[in-house]
């Protein structure tokens, strides 16, 4: 059972997935910092000096932090757009690879003539053997 697990864990897809999850987690932290520390303060200045993280509505004893929600939505949009651009780039590379594989080499005129001469000589040789 340990051997089977080792074979499973060493497969390229599992390792790629693990690396992707780790990098994705780190990327998420970078985007969160970008939104919280750079984008939202600039947006706050543009719309009148508001700090979005502190925006809230108090209803009874409940406090609804909609500013934090706005920041989370912006995080999501930036991460989604970044992933979209990355996947689009990967798909473009895959299409280019497929197109390169589909290109069929057409023999040049010299090759065609040499092939015809070879076939004619082979045919003549077989005709002489039959006689």
Swiss-Prot record:
Its main location: membrane. GO terms for cellular component: plasma membrane. It holds the Pfam family MscL. Disulfide bonds: none annotated. The keyword Signal does not apply. GO terms for molecular function: mechanosensitive monoatomic ion channel activity. It is found in: Cell membrane. Keywords: Cell membrane, Ion channel, Ion transport, Membrane, Transmembrane, Transmembrane helix, Transport. The chain crosses the membrane at residues 14-34, 67-87. InterPro entries: Mechanosensitive_channel_CS (IPR019823), MS_channel (IPR001185), MSC/AndL (IPR037673), MscL_channel (IPR036019). It comes from the Bacteria. It is a multi-pass membrane protein. Channel that opens in response to stretch forces in the membrane lipid bilayer. May participate in the regulation of osmotic pressure changes within the cell. Belongs to the MscL family. NCBIfam families: mscL (TIGR00220), PRK00567.1-4 (NF001843), PRK13955.1 (NF010560). Homopentamer. This is Large-conductance mechanosensitive channel. The gene is mscL.
């Amino acid at each position: 059972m340990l051997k089977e697990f080792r074979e499973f864990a060493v497969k390229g897809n599992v390792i790629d997935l693990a690396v992707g999850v780790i990098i994705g987690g780190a990327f998420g932290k970078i985007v969160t910092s970008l939104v919280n520390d750079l984008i939202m303060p600039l947006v706050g200045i543009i719309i009148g000096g508001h700090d979005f993280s502190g925006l809230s509505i108090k209803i009874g004893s409940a406090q609804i932090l909609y500013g934090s929600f706005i920041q989370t939505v912006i995080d999501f949009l930036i991460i989604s757009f970044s992933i979209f651009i990355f996947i689009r780039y990967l798909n473009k590379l895959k299409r280019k690879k497929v197109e390169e594989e589909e290109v069929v080499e057409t023999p040049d005129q010299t090759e065609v003539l040499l092939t015809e001469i070879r076939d004619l000589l082979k045919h003549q040789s077989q005709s002489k053997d039959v006689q």
